[in-house]
Amino acid sequence: MSVRESFNPESYELDKSFRLTRFAELKGTGCKVPQDVLQKLLESLQENHFQEDEQFLGAVMPRLGIGMDTCVIPLRHGGLSLVQTTDYIYPIVDDPYMMGRIACANVLSDLYAMGVTECDNMLMLLGVSNKLTDRERDKVMPLIIQGFKDAAEEAGTSVTGGQTVLNPWVVLGGVATTVCQPNEFIMPDNAVPGDVLVLTKPLGTQVAVAVHQWLDIPEKWNKIKLVVTQEDVELAYQEAMMNMARLNRTAAGLMHTFNAHAATDITGFGILGHAQNLAKQQRNEVSFVIHNLPVLAKMAAVSKACGNMFGLMHGSCPETSGGLLICLPREQAARFCAEIKSPKYGEGHQAWIIGIVEKGNRTARIIDKPRIIEVAPQVASQNVNPTPGATS
């Protein structure tokens, strides 16, 4: 996917001050309920979950549900399983078309975390802000829908329905569904001591989009202008937007090639939160230890200049449509990282070995002084495509 021109509201006959991100007070997957609160809220759903499964198919086929990236439900016939996920987010970038692509990629990412590469069907869930003027609604929402549709088509699937409602905030999400044979998905519970942890997208998207908005807020920009330039911020923002819109489909396919033992995608709970959640699901007594944090260039410095208000160094900074965190056999991990960069997968993208799986008590932690890997922006060397539907 090529870099796009910056979204210009006036090209769509909108006021130049229009910002999509102003139609929600929370950003991206920063809307997630905290993990500990979520677990308490879902306790009543979990009580009878596995009892029903045992009555249905016993332990013949794997089942996954409450609290994980997707649900895996054994079907009554044919040895098949239904794999399904739903997700939604609030606007995190001001380009409506890219926001649609990001929302779609974010939904699909939960399937990809299971090693599923084919999605049979998608539904789109839209909340149209009742604070939008008629003109804003009629110009912006079709761009969002087109972005969502284009990302679905890139994933080899289609949008066949959904639900659209009025809401105080703009809400973007969907449902992704597929029917799989057991060898088409990878249960996220087989990590063993000696595995390594691989991450397929850099961290820091939430920081990048936040500081990009600070360019228009002098009192906030003044706090960080000594550690980052406006050009640095623009590049980080473009890189974050492209990363969020990029599908994790290639990584999902390579999970099979290189014998992945478990995976999750990194979104609203931050890398540590999702690593902890994945560690809890393991059948073996293991723990995850993270030594390296790949971060969008200059965003670690920005985070430190802000007193680490984003939680980036602690692993609690939310990501939107982040990468996959994959447990791979040590001997396979370097080959995975080399393969995902191959031009045969389009532009080719980096992945990083960030930690290890060791014998433990199903916890995850980041070491006291993790190595920060500054990830240079790829967008600087790419062609710029015009925004679709804009008038000159």
Swiss-Prot record:
InterPro entries: PurM-like_C_dom, PurM-like_C_sf, PurM-like_N, PurM-like_N_sf, SPS/SelD
GO MF, one example: protein heterodimerization activity
Residues forming the catalytic site: 31
Cofactor(s) essential for the protein: Mg(2+)
Binding site for Mg(2+): 69, 110, 265
Record text on cofactor binding: Binds 1 Mg(2+) ion per monomer.
Enzyme Commission number: 2.7.9.3
SUPFAM superfamilies named among the record's database cross-references: PurM C-terminal domain-like, PurM N-terminal domain-like
Superkingdom as given in the UniProt entry: Eukaryota
Membrane topology, record value: Peripheral membrane protein
SS bond list: none
NCBIfam families on file: selD
Similarity comment text for this entry: Belongs to the selenophosphate synthase 1 family. Class II subfamily.
Protein's UniProt name: Selenide, water dikinase 1
Gene: sephs1
